[in-house]
Amino acid sequence: GNNSEEETRETLDVPNTRYDDTELCFLTRDESEWSTLEIFAENQSSDSDNISNAVFERNDRILQAYGVTITELKKATGEHHGSLTNEVAAPTGDFQAVVTNTVNSASFASNGYLWNLNADEIEFMDFTKSWWDGNMAEGMSIDNRLYFATGDLLTSDNDATFVIMFNKKLVKDYKDIPDLYALVENGEWTMDELYKYEQLAVQDNNGNGKLDYDTDICGLAYTGDVPYCVLFGGGITLCTKDEDDMPIYSLDVQRADDIAEKGKLLFSKDHTINLNDVVNTGGITMYEAGVKTFGEGHALFMGEVMQCVTRMRVADVDFGILP
């Protein structure tokens, strides 16, 4: 058994070279809930969270093995984009890599600010290795050029994975809702099922003819990005690739129309609450709106990213997670 494991274990394929006294600095994000946590940690202690301790240990191993010190230059939202633009225009050498979001990544790449990671001079980056997100590398390349990637280096891409949370108490209150985990395991968790259960939960407690986030109960609370995820989750893609790795428009119009029609039902105002509307009219933050609506039992389901699972732990709500 051990021999087989050794034969199949992936190798790093990086030469045993020392780069003593070299500093590798990442331009990172200082953006409230989306601050970069995975590049640099000041120290390791029992008071630190698991991610910080793992980051510190990884950076120390890199220092010991290769002589490279990992640092970061953290910039706020309004300065992050400009920092890279200025560095390209007038290089200072203050940083060599950047952690950013996909919107900035596309802008940086189209403006020629980033290295092509598939170029011959970029060695030892094999995106078929399991620690890289191979699907992203394959999907984001154009003409065999790739300008950004993600993988085990970051946790923020996992935090940004969209899920559906459900209130376990409310599920028990509605006898017509079955074991939701069993639906998933049996391949029966569909948009039609979600729509059916959303409608069961609606309670206009204050009788004003609309669903309020702080008094009523809705079937689904969601933010503005969730409808896009319904399209992606429905298998909708705009492009495929040809043999030269060039994008080809290939939208399945009929399927897209079918999914859009289901989306109109899922997000109908008579059984949902759009948290963006709550923020725009209620004078509260998105964090407060989410915790109040879902965390205090005013929504059966809530659609958002995995990071909101962590945020919701401040609330007294017993909830589960569905795809």
What are these regions (language model features)?
Residues 96-99, 295, 299-304:
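Paired acidic/hydrophobic, glycine-rich loop segments that form the ligand-binding mouth/hinge
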Residues 312-323:
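Extracytoplasmic/periplasmic substrate-recognition and gating elements
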Residues 35-67:
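Short, polar/charged alpha-helical segment
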Residues 27, 92-98, 102, 139-164, ...:
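Extracytoplasmic/periplasmic solute-binding protein
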Residues 195-198, 229-231, 236-283:
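Glycine-centered hinge/linker elements that transmit conformational signals in sensory
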Residues 74-84, 188-193, 276-292:
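Short helix-initiation/N-cap motifs at beta->coil->alpha
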Residues 65-141:
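Extracytoplasmic "Venus flytrap"/periplasmic binding protein-like
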Residues 1-21:
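Short, low-complexity disordered leader/linker segments with a strong preference
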